Amino acid sequence: MRRMLVGFFFLWTFAAHAQTRAVAPTSAAANRIYSPGVNAGDYIYVSGQGPRKPDGTLPATVREQIRQALDNVKLVVEAAHLTMEHVVYVQVYLEDMTQYPEVNGVFGEVLPKTPPARAVLGVAKLPDPGIQINAVAVRSLAEKRAVYPPNYKSAESASPGILTGDRLFVSGMLGVDPATGQVPDDPADQVDLALDRMKSVLEAAGLDLRHMVFVNPYLTEKIPTRVMNERYARRFEFGNTPARATIEVSSLPGGAHIEYTGVAVRDLKQRRAVRPKNMPPSPTASPCVFAGNTLYCSAKSGFIPGAHGGVYANTTAHQLRQTMRNQLDNLEEAEMTFDQVVSTNVYLDDLSDVRAFDDVYVQYFNGVLPARTTIEQIAPGERKPDKDDHYPDLEQMSLIAVRNTSNR
């Protein structure tokens, strides 16, 4: 009988650990679109948090707004019974990049011990003005440590990398000379410099670029995508590249025009690229890549694949349906469903389309809604078809899903 009880206890413990759960502070208002946070076992994913207080008021100063956004992250983390020391990675979105020094200062005050890896991005518009911060927290601190390349010097209140038991989270590595603060004139040199800096963080953790499972190249209009892709493809094995979300942004810290940030897996045996049968291998991005039980999926748009592929829908809602079809192809190839998605990043051409986007988005999820970050990264463009009747992307979405969990 005792053996049966012990066995039941371990089975219950495993089930509790494996089940995905929504995380919400007691002060959080009901939300039909996303969860404030999602507990996915070893990691907690925190939705983008704005600068408003729980009562809806906006602090008076920029510095207070930055601190409040961090406090809102803290409320979600604490609702998962963790502390800010468990936060390993954050992305900070700013409408005004001149506020970056204040962001750096507040982070240094709030997270002085082992600051998380961090990427800071200038965007056109946010759901709440000023700032938005999302986060990833690790449940176990046993193997958490900061990673610094040799001779690394920086005034940043962020760790270049944070190592956990199974992953490495890499801060945004800018195409800026760290010794002089100068931005090279040649876009190709800027790309190479940013890639070299990302590589140095990996090597300081005993890893290399083969270990990357997801990369965000963030670039301004000054970096041609063709140049970025050509230099990037040289660094990775064809057909086995990391998943990727390449996002044009309005600005980056230090006057940079390119920044790489991402996630690596420590054990290469835990890494596996996933590619639907209707997609050819790519020199720049795998559709999705596993890091153990976690699936990182590239940003997808409403692009119809195939010989005559392109974006043919002319509204955000219609494009999103094709985006979800594309992401479902990825998930099904990994033998997963939308119900195992724990976090999404949504990039809209025009944030005023968010309601139309949401009305379609929620139809694809049952039970626990994923954590979510939503931004308008650059000013809206013209919504006109080209000579082939292709429309510009009005939305993009990347996602993270966790296998062997259920959120029903």
What residue spans do the PLM features occupy?
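Bacterial N-terminal signal peptides
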Residues: 4-15
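N-terminal presequence-like segments and the immediate start of the first folded domain
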Residues: 17-71, 75-89, 93-196, 200-214, ...
